[in-house]
Amino acid sequence: MSSVYDGNLTVSIFGQSHAPAIGVTIDGLPAGLPVDLDALGRFLRRRAPGQNAWSTPRKEADLPEFLCGLKDGRTCGAPLTAIIRNTNTRSGDYENLMDIPRPGHADYTAQVKFGGAQDAAGGGHFSGRLTAPLCIAGGLCLQILARQGVRVRARIVSIGTVTDDAAFDAPVDEKPFPAVSDEAAAAMQAQIAQVKAEQDSVGGVIECVIEGLPAGIGDPMFGGLENRIARTVFAIPAVKGVEFGAGFAAARLRGSENNDPFCVENGKIVTKTNHCGGILGGISNGMPVVFRAAFKPTPSISREQDSVSLSRMEETKLVVYGRHDPCIVPRAVPCVEAAAAIAVLDAVMERKKELGYGY
């Protein structure tokens, strides 16, 4: 199972939604880096379930236990492993899913891939629960990047038909609902409440901005910065699309409209616009890196759906039980930050190797 990000950093995520624990092992972190466990805890709480009306009622403390890799509050050079114990599981809600797969979920493809050996409870290894260890790894990477002047921040751009058009010039990480406009946030919450009452779900779009990244980070072709970021962001369950800068809208522009003119500002080369999203030829150009990730609606919904019985090879009806988010987008905001931070730190480490100096 491909649950390992392998670069200058190696990030291996393990566990299942209803297993005794989930966790992550990170190899390649330089020794001696300080780790702020309080800040990491605050970051993980932004993703934690059971905190409000628009998330799953499953409550988990999500307290990381570091088994190795830390000594006296600093990385010690050894692989770092942390786990989060699962304490609130109801596996009985999922017993029928080995035979009747949920539409939109990985139940059927997992059955084909693993021949019935997979753990279906809570979605098993395919569950959004596995974004908790992703956030442990990404939270540590965020701290390392911040000490180098690189800031990664994300916000909700849209949920369903509601869009937040406000400029991303205010922090949202301490808001209970991470949208810039409070008016848009209220409308988004109302839409989530509506689909929840209708036993349905809704998706949305998250925007991420990476500031302070110098020019020259990344590579052409397969090692491009877009490639690295997209690869990690697609590890988040429910992500169905990633676009950088103007993204798909660039296909409707002319070159004279899409090109970002260069200029000199305070002795530094910058661009007057940022349609490229801070990346040219797979390499950062010194402008903010901007991308958006599209999230599909949560596939586990309570209304009756059409499916099939795999054992009987006939069509049947399915009602999904269990505890699920009517919209996973609000809790996914720190996950996008975490995924981006892993990719960016890996690319920064690559650049330092190219320049011939240590971390």
Residue positions per predicted region:
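Alpha-helical support elements that line or immediately flank enzyme active sites
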Residues: 20-32, 128-150, 223, 227, ...
